[in-house]
Regions:
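N-terminal glycine-rich phosphate-binding loop for ADP-containing cofactors
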Residues: 1-429, 438-471, 478-484, 490-492, ...
Length: 693
């Protein structure tokens, strides 16, 4: 079969002899132009191709995917000295555009870039546990979300990777780097070896550094090797630092802390930054590759050199010298030349150039002239070529009152100004978490139902205005797109979605129904999918939409979102999320060039009336009897069915959009007064998880 393909990826056992034998077999059957790559994470790339023809070696390289490949963006491309330049460029282009990867060209050195630096960081944490008296929980607190890294931090990450895998990686690195001045950090500590020998390998065996016992999370005592409940943290005023919203400010506050937290962080980060700098040019040609590798492969918000920038070049350099941490020669040289330094425009990290098919919002916003309008939670930006961008800046990109009012203001500007169209999007990891529940809860608790009613009318009117706006509006979405965020996207005439988009109408999870046009559009979707207006043909699609919303299903990808009805078949799906704003802008320009006209108003939507409502309610009853949903879920499902079948209509009828929007409003408002809905909202705000009461 591989004789017919253009790219062969090898991912067999990490044994050099086996890989070499396989490559000999592969060479005998592949096409003359086929690219061959190895996914090895530790073996020298050039040795795997040893003995192969010159033609084969020109088309051979390493392609190290990070697991799971679908969700981790990093792809390390590792050419050998024989790899043809055009092959490297072709693989970079293909992986970025069609696989959605962040591609970093690494050198053929032990464990390449991300695993070399990432393993070093984990081993630093292990040393602090065994030599400096910090607890597992303290180290994970100081190396997790507090400093812009995943919640798994150090020891949870080790457990997830597998302690046997971690030990294998460290043992693989250690003998392969005899000239690394810090190689002793990779020496496997007795605690790690003991855990592996006793079969405590982490998540895959149920215990490693952590162990879950019932609902309690225990951690290993490094002295007694007994799992114990977490002890109180002795990290001074760490809670105050955790509350600082900006990561750069948070890092600086932690770095300057005079207690145990600051002591740990300074030693940890100075060693990490020093080591990263000393690995240039051994493992990478510049700081950019290392930062990208750590952000894309390990999920760090800032790479090592971006952290250095945040803390201040001269501050970090002086502190390294004060504690005798070796400073890389290139850092010394450029520092002496005055190239970098606190308060200067230049930094230790030369910003990577943005590809032509991406839009860097940070660069765009650096020029004040590009900000056309703003409030504390949103802004209207000039993307150039007559296209504007409405950007959310609220917490979680929620649709707060300021965001909703700002969007209306943006449409006013767009309508009267010399603009060709609008993109709605942002650079966050998630497009929108939905409506601002905290604002809604405050209004409900105050008894100001009329204010909520007015807000719903405002939101519905805004969604309709977007849908029928005379100029093209394109949503550029990615990540989570929930509740009101989903309704906003469904209102946009055109959408550009990252493949990794998780979109859904999840309002039933907080005891409500979609109230900003989401139900109206799903009813319309069901009617449009049917072959005719016959209730018999519409019913299966309506049933599917009812189940999707009733179970608060979130699509697992943009492709599944099209199946669910959240995204239209015309949605443009991009594999690389970084391209979504650029592609959305191009869509605006294309639509405008083609003589854009808004979609026609829908004045004849077929709803199925009481017979269909009875069928939907019966389906909910079966779910309730089977123990799949609660009694209150069943009640909510009945209200959902009421709206989706046309309210009190007794027979299938044609209605307009306003009829369904009114049903949404009339059904939504009473639910806010229900105690169980208020419990669900309070629980979501407190725990970020739905309550099924």
């Amino acid at each position: 079969r591989i004789a017919d393909v253009d790219w062969v990826i090898e991912a067999v056992v990490e044994n050099l002899r086996i890989k070499q034998q396989l490559m000999a077999r592969v060479e005998s059957v592949i096409r003359d132009h086929a690219v061959v790559s190895t996914n090895t994470s530790g073996l020298p790339i050039h040795l795997i191709a040893q003995g192969r023809s010159e033609s084969f070696r020109k088309r051979f390289l390493g392609t190290h995917f990070f697991n799971p490949p679908r969700y981790l963006k990093l792809l390390e491309v590792i050419p050998t000295t024989d790899t043809a330049t055009e092959i490297i460029k072709r693989m970079q282009w293909f992986a970025r555009l069609h696989l959605g990867k962040g591609v970093v060209v690494a050198k053929d050195t032990p464990n390449f870039i991300a695993n070399r630096i990432g393993t070093y960081a984990i081993m630093l944490g292990l040393r602090a546990l065994t030599e400096h008296g910090y607890t597992i929980e303290e180290i994970d607190t100081l190396t997790g979300t507090l400093v812009g890294r995943p919640k798994s931090a150090t020891f949870r990450t080790a457990d997830l990777v597998g302690l046997d895998t971690l030990m294998y990686v460290a043992e693989n690195i250690y003998p392969a780097i005899p000239h690394d001045e810090s190689r002793e950090i990779f020496h496997v500590p007795p605690l790690l070896r003991k855990l592996v020998e006793t079969g405590s390998l982490g998540a895959k065996t149920g215990q490693g550094f952590y162990k879950k016992q019932g609902k309690e999370i225990l951690s290993i005592n490094p002295v007694t090797l007994v799992y114990e409940p977490a002890k109180p943290l002795h990290l001074g005023d760490i809670e105050a630092i955790e509350k600082i919203p900006d990561l750069g400010d948070r890092l600086r506050a932690l770095y300057q802390d005079k207690g145990r937290a600051g002591t740990f962080f300074r030693e940890f980060i100075l060693n990490l930054l020093g080591y990263s700098a000393r690995r240039i040019p051994e493992i990478a040609d510049s700081p950019i590759e290392i930062d990208q590798a750590m952000r894309w492969g390990f999920g760090w918000e800032l790479g090592p050199f971006e952290i250095w920038d945040a803390l201040g070049f001269e501050t970090v350099l002086a502190d390294m010298k004060a504690v005798d941490i070796p400073v890389a020669e290139w850092v010394k040289k450029d520092g002496e030349m005055g190239r970098w330094g606190d308060g200067r425009n230049e930094s230790i990290l030369m910003s990577p150039s943005t590809p032509l098919d991406e839009i860097n919002l940070a660069t765009l916003k650096a020029d004040p002239k590009n900000t056309l309008w703003q409030n504390p939670e949103a802004a209207l930006l000039d993307l150039g070529d007559g296209v504007a961008l409405y950007e959310f800046r609220s917490k979680g990109n929620t649709l707060s009152l300021k965001v909703v009012d700002g969007l209306a203001e943006a449409l006013d500007i767009l309508e009267t100004g010399d603009f060709r169209g609008l993109v709605i999007g942002n650079s966050g990891a998630n497009f929108s978490a939905g409506a601002n529940l905290a604002e809604m809860a405050m209004l409900a608790q105050s008894g100001n139902i009329q204010a909520i009613a007015n807000l719903i009318v405002k939101f519905q009117s805004l969604m309709q205005r977007i849908h029928y706006f005379p100029k093209p509006i394109v949503a550029a979405i990615n990540g989570r797109v929930l509740g009101g965020g989903c309704e906003l996207v469904m209102a946009c005439p055109q959408v550009v979605a990252a493949a990794e988009t998780y979109i859904g109408l999840v309002e039933l999870g907080v005891g409500l129904i979609p109230g900003a046009g989401g139900l109206m559009r799903m009813v319309t979707w069901a009617a449009d999918r049917a072959a005719t207006e016959s209730p018999h043909h519409i019913q299966p699609f309506l049933q599917k939409a009812f189940e999707t919303i009733g179970m608060a299903k979130v699509a697992n990808s943009a492709y599944e979102a099209q199946e669910f009805g959240y995204l239209a078949p015309t949605t443009k799906i991009v594999m690389n999320s970084d391209r979504r704003l650029y592609v959305a802008k191009e869509e605006v320009l294309r639509l405008e060039r083609e003589g854009y006209a808004p979609p026609p108003e829908r004045n004849a939507i077929m709803v199925l009336g009481r017979p269909a409502r009875a069928m939907l309610e019966h389906a909910a009853y079966i779910m309730y009897q089977g123990g799949y949903i609660s009694e209150y879920d069943r009640f909510l499902a009945s209200r959902l069915a009421y709206v989706m079948t046309g309210g009190e209509l007794t027979v299938p009828s044609l209605v307009d959009e306003n009829y369904l929007l009114q049903l949404e409003r009339e059904t939504f408002l009473p639910l806010l007064s229900q105690p169980k809905t208020q419990e669900r909202i309070a629980h979501m705000l407190k725990t970020k998880k739905p309550l099924r009461n």
